[in-house]
Protein backbone atom coordinates (compact mmCIF):
# COMPACT_ATOMS: atom_id res chain seq x y z
CA UNK A 1 0.00 0.00 0.00
CA UNK A 2 1.17 3.50 -0.82
CA UNK A 3 1.18 5.64 2.33
CA UNK A 4 -0.18 9.07 1.46
CA UNK A 5 -0.29 12.41 3.28
CA UNK A 6 -2.61 15.27 2.37
CA UNK A 7 -1.13 18.61 3.36
CA UNK A 8 -3.94 21.15 3.54
CA UNK A 9 -6.81 18.72 3.95
CA UNK A 10 -9.48 21.10 5.26
CA UNK A 11 -10.29 22.77 1.93
CA UNK A 12 -12.51 21.57 -0.88
CA UNK A 13 -9.66 19.95 -2.81
CA UNK A 14 -8.51 18.23 0.38
CA UNK A 15 -11.87 16.65 1.13
CA UNK A 16 -12.22 15.59 -2.50
CA UNK A 17 -8.85 13.84 -2.29
CA UNK A 18 -10.10 12.01 0.80
CA UNK A 19 -13.35 11.04 -0.92
CA UNK A 20 -11.62 9.72 -4.03
CA UNK A 21 -8.78 7.94 -2.24
CA UNK A 22 -11.18 6.17 0.13
CA UNK A 23 -12.07 3.97 -2.86
CA UNK A 24 -8.47 3.52 -4.03
CA UNK A 25 -7.28 -0.07 -3.46
CA UNK A 26 -3.56 0.80 -3.40
CA UNK A 27 -3.59 3.80 -1.03
CA UNK A 28 -3.65 4.28 2.73
CA UNK A 29 -4.06 7.83 4.06
CA UNK A 30 -1.67 8.16 6.99
CA UNK A 31 -1.64 11.90 7.67
CA UNK A 32 -3.82 14.97 7.09
CA UNK A 33 -2.90 18.52 8.04
CA UNK A 34 -4.68 21.81 8.63
CA UNK A 35 -3.26 24.82 10.40
CA UNK A 36 -6.75 26.18 11.18
CA UNK A 37 -8.30 22.91 12.36
CA UNK A 38 -5.36 21.05 13.91
CA UNK A 39 -6.50 18.74 16.69
CA UNK A 40 -9.95 18.16 15.23
CA UNK A 41 -11.09 14.88 13.73
CA UNK A 42 -11.37 15.13 9.97
CA UNK A 43 -14.95 13.84 10.26
CA UNK A 44 -15.75 16.79 12.53
CA UNK A 45 -14.61 19.23 9.86
CA UNK A 46 -16.28 17.21 7.08
CA UNK A 47 -19.28 15.19 8.37
CA UNK A 48 -19.47 13.40 5.00
CA UNK A 49 -16.43 11.40 6.14
CA UNK A 50 -18.05 10.02 9.32
CA UNK A 51 -17.33 6.34 10.00
CA UNK A 52 -14.89 6.26 7.08
CA UNK A 53 -11.87 8.12 8.44
CA UNK A 54 -10.56 8.23 12.00
CA UNK A 55 -7.77 10.67 11.21
CA UNK A 56 -7.06 13.77 13.27
CA UNK A 57 -5.86 16.91 11.53
CA UNK A 58 -2.30 17.89 12.44
CA UNK A 59 -0.08 20.92 12.22
CA UNK A 60 2.23 21.05 9.24
CA UNK A 61 5.55 19.50 10.31
CA UNK A 62 7.24 18.16 7.15
CA UNK A 63 9.75 15.82 8.82
CA UNK A 64 7.10 14.12 10.97
CA UNK A 65 4.80 13.81 7.98
CA UNK A 66 7.55 12.35 5.79
CA UNK A 67 8.26 9.69 8.41
CA UNK A 68 4.75 8.31 7.89
CA UNK A 69 4.12 8.88 4.19
CA UNK A 70 5.66 7.80 0.90
CA UNK A 71 3.72 10.24 -1.25
CA UNK A 72 2.53 13.80 -0.60
CA UNK A 73 -0.35 15.86 -1.93
CA UNK A 74 0.04 19.55 -1.13
CA UNK A 75 -3.35 21.27 -1.30
CA UNK A 76 -2.19 24.65 -0.03
CA UNK A 77 -2.55 28.22 -1.29
CA UNK A 78 0.20 29.63 -3.49
CA UNK A 79 3.33 30.61 -1.56
CA UNK A 80 2.46 28.20 1.28
CA UNK A 81 3.23 25.26 -0.99
CA UNK A 82 6.66 26.51 -2.05
CA UNK A 83 7.61 26.85 1.61
CA UNK A 84 7.27 23.08 2.22
CA UNK A 85 7.61 21.26 -1.12
CA UNK A 86 11.44 21.52 -1.23
CA UNK A 87 11.66 19.87 2.19
CA UNK A 88 9.53 16.93 1.11
CA UNK A 89 11.64 16.48 -2.01
CA UNK A 90 14.88 16.56 0.00
CA UNK A 91 13.41 13.87 2.24
CA UNK A 92 12.94 11.67 -0.82
CA UNK A 93 9.18 12.05 -1.18
CA UNK A 94 7.31 12.46 -4.44
CA UNK A 95 4.82 15.30 -4.56
CA UNK A 96 1.76 16.39 -6.47
CA UNK A 97 1.23 20.08 -5.75
CA UNK A 98 -2.26 21.46 -6.33
CA UNK A 99 -1.26 25.11 -5.94
CA UNK A 100 -0.01 27.42 -8.69
CA UNK A 101 3.53 27.50 -7.29
CA UNK A 102 5.20 25.12 -9.76
CA UNK A 103 3.05 25.41 -12.89
CA UNK A 104 4.96 28.22 -14.62
CA UNK A 105 8.41 27.49 -16.03
CA UNK A 106 9.57 31.11 -15.96
CA UNK A 107 10.37 32.60 -12.53
CA UNK A 108 9.95 36.13 -13.89
CA UNK A 109 6.51 35.24 -15.20
CA UNK A 110 5.57 33.81 -11.81
CA UNK A 111 6.75 36.98 -10.11
CA UNK A 112 4.75 39.15 -12.51
CA UNK A 113 1.51 37.36 -11.64
CA UNK A 114 2.15 36.35 -8.03
CA UNK A 115 5.35 37.32 -6.18
CA UNK A 116 9.06 36.41 -6.23
CA UNK A 117 9.54 32.64 -6.24
CA UNK A 118 11.41 31.15 -3.29
CA UNK A 119 12.94 28.21 -5.20
CA UNK A 120 12.99 28.98 -8.94
CA UNK A 121 15.23 26.02 -9.80
CA UNK A 122 12.31 23.71 -9.00
CA UNK A 123 10.25 25.42 -11.71
CA UNK A 124 12.55 23.80 -14.25
CA UNK A 125 12.33 20.39 -12.57
CA UNK A 126 8.58 20.20 -12.04
CA UNK A 127 6.36 18.56 -14.65
CA UNK A 128 3.07 20.10 -15.68
CA UNK A 129 0.55 17.44 -14.75
CA UNK A 130 -1.92 17.26 -17.61
CA UNK A 131 -1.87 13.49 -18.24
CA UNK A 132 -3.31 13.64 -21.74
CA UNK A 133 -0.31 15.73 -22.82
CA UNK A 134 2.52 14.82 -20.40
CA UNK A 135 1.98 11.19 -19.42
CA UNK A 136 5.56 9.96 -19.94
CA UNK A 137 7.16 12.89 -18.13
CA UNK A 138 4.69 12.60 -15.26
CA UNK A 139 5.61 8.93 -14.80
CA UNK A 140 9.23 9.80 -14.01
CA UNK A 141 8.67 13.02 -12.08
CA UNK A 142 9.34 13.69 -8.41
CA UNK A 143 7.30 16.91 -8.47
CA UNK A 144 4.15 17.30 -10.53
CA UNK A 145 2.39 20.66 -10.76
CA UNK A 146 -1.30 19.87 -10.92
CA UNK A 147 -2.95 22.12 -13.52
CA UNK A 148 -5.48 24.80 -12.66
CA UNK A 149 -9.17 24.24 -13.31
CA UNK A 150 -9.69 26.83 -16.05
CA UNK A 151 -6.45 25.83 -17.82
CA UNK A 152 -7.50 22.17 -17.84
CA UNK A 153 -10.78 22.95 -19.57
CA UNK A 154 -9.24 25.34 -22.11
CA UNK A 155 -6.09 23.34 -22.93
CA UNK A 156 -7.92 20.05 -23.44
CA UNK A 157 -10.43 21.90 -25.57
CA UNK A 158 -7.79 23.40 -27.87
CA UNK A 159 -4.94 20.87 -27.93
CA UNK A 160 -5.89 19.00 -31.13
CA UNK A 161 -6.51 22.19 -33.11
CA UNK A 162 -3.21 23.78 -32.12
CA UNK A 163 -1.17 20.61 -32.50
CA UNK A 164 -2.48 20.16 -36.05
CA UNK A 165 -2.19 23.92 -36.77
CA UNK A 166 -5.82 24.13 -37.83
CA UNK A 167 -6.52 27.50 -36.17
CA UNK A 168 -4.86 30.90 -36.08
CA UNK A 169 -3.49 31.16 -32.50
CA UNK A 170 -3.92 34.94 -32.51
CA UNK A 171 -7.71 34.59 -32.77
CA UNK A 172 -8.36 32.45 -29.67
CA UNK A 173 -11.06 33.67 -27.29
CA UNK A 174 -11.94 31.58 -24.23
CA UNK A 175 -15.06 32.35 -22.21
CA UNK A 176 -15.30 30.22 -19.06
CA UNK A 177 -17.94 29.89 -16.35
CA UNK A 178 -17.20 28.37 -12.95
CA UNK A 179 -19.08 27.32 -9.85
CA UNK A 180 -18.35 29.06 -6.56
CA UNK A 181 -16.21 26.26 -5.11
CA UNK A 182 -13.45 27.36 -7.48
CA UNK A 183 -12.83 30.30 -5.15
CA UNK A 184 -11.96 27.97 -2.25
CA UNK A 185 -13.45 27.43 1.19
CA UNK A 186 -12.21 30.50 3.06
CA UNK A 187 -14.78 33.20 3.85
CA UNK A 188 -15.04 36.00 1.28
CA UNK A 189 -17.79 38.59 0.94
CA UNK A 190 -17.97 38.09 -2.83
CA UNK A 191 -18.81 34.42 -2.31
CA UNK A 192 -21.60 34.82 0.23
CA UNK A 193 -24.98 33.38 -0.73
CA UNK A 194 -26.67 36.75 -1.20
CA UNK A 195 -23.77 38.00 -3.32
CA UNK A 196 -23.81 35.00 -5.66
CA UNK A 197 -27.36 33.65 -5.79
CA UNK A 198 -29.48 34.68 -8.80
CA UNK A 199 -26.47 36.43 -10.30
CA UNK A 200 -23.95 35.81 -13.06
CA UNK A 201 -20.86 37.99 -13.40
CA UNK A 202 -17.51 38.26 -15.12
CA UNK A 203 -14.31 38.83 -13.16
CA UNK A 204 -10.63 39.11 -13.97
CA UNK A 205 -11.73 40.99 -17.09
CA UNK A 206 -9.17 42.46 -19.47
CA UNK A 207 -6.48 39.81 -19.13
CA UNK A 208 -6.24 40.02 -15.34
CA UNK A 209 -6.81 36.40 -14.27
CA UNK A 210 -3.80 34.51 -12.90
CA UNK A 211 -4.53 31.40 -14.95
CA UNK A 212 -3.75 33.26 -18.18
CA UNK A 213 0.05 32.71 -18.16
CA UNK A 214 -0.47 29.01 -17.42
CA UNK A 215 -2.90 28.64 -20.32
CA UNK A 216 -0.63 30.59 -22.68
CA UNK A 217 2.45 28.63 -21.62
CA UNK A 218 0.90 25.27 -22.47
CA UNK A 219 -0.92 26.41 -25.61
CA UNK A 220 2.31 27.98 -26.89
CA UNK A 221 4.07 24.63 -26.54
CA UNK A 222 1.30 22.96 -28.53
CA UNK A 223 1.35 25.65 -31.21
CA UNK A 224 5.14 25.71 -31.46
CA UNK A 225 5.25 29.47 -30.98
CA UNK A 226 4.38 32.08 -28.39
CA UNK A 227 0.73 33.07 -28.34
CA UNK A 228 -1.66 35.20 -26.33
CA UNK A 229 -5.35 34.57 -25.78
CA UNK A 230 -8.36 36.58 -24.69
CA UNK A 231 -9.67 34.85 -21.56
CA UNK A 232 -12.60 35.95 -19.42
CA UNK A 233 -13.86 33.88 -16.47
CA UNK A 234 -17.36 34.15 -15.01
CA UNK A 235 -18.86 33.15 -11.67
CA UNK A 236 -22.19 31.33 -11.78
CA UNK A 237 -24.41 30.37 -8.81
CA UNK A 238 -23.68 26.65 -8.66
CA UNK A 239 -21.43 24.63 -6.36
CA UNK A 240 -19.08 23.14 -8.91
CA UNK A 241 -18.34 22.80 -12.57
CA UNK A 242 -16.64 24.70 -15.39
CA UNK A 243 -18.00 25.24 -18.88
CA UNK A 244 -15.58 26.82 -21.35
CA UNK A 245 -16.70 28.07 -24.75
CA UNK A 246 -13.70 28.68 -26.98
CA UNK A 247 -13.63 30.46 -30.33
CA UNK A 248 -10.94 30.62 -33.02
CA UNK A 249 -10.57 31.24 -36.74
CA UNK A 250 -9.51 28.19 -38.77
CA UNK A 251 -6.51 28.35 -41.08
CA UNK A 252 -8.47 26.66 -43.86
CA UNK A 253 -11.82 25.16 -44.73
CA UNK A 254 -12.98 22.59 -42.17
CA UNK A 255 -16.31 20.99 -41.27
CA UNK A 256 -17.76 19.97 -37.93
CA UNK A 257 -17.54 16.32 -38.99
CA UNK A 258 -13.84 16.69 -39.79
CA UNK A 259 -13.21 18.31 -36.41
CA UNK A 260 -14.95 15.47 -34.62
CA UNK A 261 -12.84 12.93 -36.49
CA UNK A 262 -9.69 14.84 -35.50
CA UNK A 263 -10.65 15.02 -31.82
CA UNK A 264 -11.67 11.38 -31.63
CA UNK A 265 -8.33 10.34 -33.09
CA UNK A 266 -6.33 12.71 -30.88
CA UNK A 267 -7.98 11.54 -27.66
CA UNK A 268 -8.36 7.89 -28.64
CA UNK A 269 -7.71 5.69 -25.62
CA UNK A 270 -8.00 8.53 -23.12
CA UNK A 271 -10.13 7.28 -20.24
CA UNK A 272 -11.34 10.68 -19.11
CA UNK A 273 -11.93 12.69 -22.29
CA UNK A 274 -15.28 12.16 -23.99
CA UNK A 275 -15.89 13.63 -27.44
CA UNK A 276 -19.61 14.17 -27.94
CA UNK A 277 -21.49 13.40 -31.16
CA UNK A 278 -22.06 16.10 -33.76
CA UNK A 279 -24.75 18.53 -32.62
CA UNK A 280 -24.35 17.55 -28.95
CA UNK A 281 -22.65 19.82 -26.42
CA UNK A 282 -21.44 19.39 -22.83
CA UNK A 283 -23.23 20.26 -19.63
CA UNK A 284 -21.58 20.63 -16.24
CA UNK A 285 -24.35 18.44 -14.82
CA UNK A 286 -23.06 15.53 -16.90
CA UNK A 287 -19.55 15.60 -15.40
CA UNK A 288 -20.37 16.68 -11.84
CA UNK A 289 -18.45 14.56 -9.33
CA UNK A 290 -16.49 12.75 -12.06
CA UNK A 291 -13.03 13.00 -13.61
CA UNK A 292 -14.37 13.41 -17.13
CA UNK A 293 -13.81 16.24 -19.56
CA UNK A 294 -16.62 16.37 -22.11
CA UNK A 295 -15.97 18.20 -25.39
CA UNK A 296 -18.37 19.30 -28.12
CA UNK A 297 -17.48 20.98 -31.41
CA UNK A 298 -19.01 23.00 -34.20
CA UNK A 299 -18.05 25.20 -37.12
CA UNK A 300 -19.95 28.47 -37.34
CA UNK A 301 -20.12 28.77 -41.13
CA UNK A 302 -21.76 32.18 -40.91
CA UNK A 303 -18.79 33.78 -39.15
CA UNK A 304 -16.11 31.32 -40.21
CA UNK A 305 -15.14 30.38 -36.66
CA UNK A 306 -14.52 27.11 -34.87
CA UNK A 307 -16.41 26.74 -31.58
CA UNK A 308 -15.25 24.28 -28.90
CA UNK A 309 -17.21 23.68 -25.70
CA UNK A 310 -15.64 21.77 -22.80
CA UNK A 311 -17.06 20.84 -19.40
CA UNK A 312 -15.29 19.57 -16.29
CA UNK A 313 -15.90 19.38 -12.57
CA UNK A 314 -13.50 22.03 -11.27
CA UNK A 315 -12.84 20.05 -8.08
CA UNK A 316 -12.24 16.71 -9.83
CA UNK A 317 -10.70 16.87 -13.30
CA UNK A 318 -9.87 20.49 -12.48
CA UNK A 319 -8.10 19.61 -9.20
CA UNK A 320 -8.26 16.51 -6.97
CA UNK A 321 -9.26 13.91 -9.55
CA UNK A 322 -6.47 14.98 -11.85
CA UNK A 323 -4.09 14.88 -8.86
CA UNK A 324 -5.07 11.26 -8.20
CA UNK A 325 -4.67 10.51 -11.91
CA UNK A 326 -1.14 11.93 -11.70
CA UNK A 327 -0.38 9.93 -8.56
CA UNK A 328 -1.50 6.77 -10.34
CA UNK A 329 0.81 7.47 -13.27
CA UNK A 330 3.76 8.30 -11.01
CA UNK A 331 3.38 5.03 -9.12
CA UNK A 332 2.65 2.71 -12.01
CA UNK A 333 -0.97 2.12 -11.00
CA UNK A 334 -3.76 1.81 -13.56
CA UNK A 335 -4.66 5.39 -14.37
CA UNK A 336 -8.33 5.03 -13.52
CA UNK A 337 -7.90 3.61 -9.98
CA UNK A 338 -10.09 5.55 -7.56
CA UNK A 339 -11.58 7.55 -10.42
CA UNK A 340 -14.26 5.30 -11.86
CA UNK A 341 -17.21 7.12 -10.27
CA UNK A 342 -19.86 8.29 -12.70
CA UNK A 343 -21.18 11.82 -12.62
CA UNK A 344 -23.76 12.74 -9.97
CA UNK A 345 -27.09 13.32 -11.72
CA UNK A 346 -29.41 15.01 -11.08
UniProtKB/Swiss-Prot annotation:
- Enzyme class, one word? oxidoreductase
User: Which InterPro entries does UniProt cross-reference here?
Assistant: AGPR_AS (IPR023013), AGPR_type-1 (IPR000706), NAD(P)-bd_dom_sf (IPR036291), NAGSA_dehydrogenase (IPR050085), Semialdehyde_DH_NAD-bd (IPR000534)
What keywords appear on the UniProt entry? Amino-acid biosynthesis, Arginine biosynthesis, Cytoplasm, NADP, Oxidoreductase
Which GO MF terms are attached to this record? N-acetyl-gamma-glutamyl-phosphate reductase activity; NAD binding; NADP+ binding
Q: What residues sit in the active site?
A: 149
Question: What superkingdom does the record give?
Answer: Bacteria
Where is it localised?
Cytoplasm
Q: Kindly give the Gene3D superfamilies that the UniProt entry links to this protein.
A: Dihydrodipicolinate Reductase, domain 2, NAD(P)-binding Rossmann-like Domain
Q: What is its main location?
A: cytoplasm
Decide whether keyword Transport is in the record: no
EC numbers for this chain: 1.2.1.38
Which transformation does this protein catalyse, written as a reaction?
Answer: N-acetyl-L-glutamate 5-semialdehyde + phosphate + NADP(+) = N-acetyl-L-glutamyl 5-phosphate + NADPH + H(+)
Tell me the SUPFAM superfamilies matching this sequence: Glyceraldehyde-3-phosphate dehydrogenase-like, C-terminal domain, NAD(P)-binding Rossmann-fold domains
Which biological process annotations from GO are given for this protein? L-arginine biosynthetic process
Q: Which SMART domains match?
A: Semialdhyde_dh
Cellular component GO terms, alphabetical: cytoplasm
Please name the pathway: Amino-acid biosynthesis; L-arginine biosynthesis; N(2)-acetyl-L-ornithine from L-glutamate: step 3/4
Q: Which family does it belong to?
A: Belongs to the NAGSA dehydrogenase family. Type 1 subfamily.
Function, as annotated, reads: Catalyzes the NADPH-dependent reduction of N-acetyl-5-glutamyl phosphate to yield N-acetyl-L-glutamate 5-semialdehyde.
**HAMAP family tied to this protein:** ArgC_type1
Q: What is this protein called?
A: N-acetyl-gamma-glutamyl-phosphate reductase
What gene codes for this chain? argC
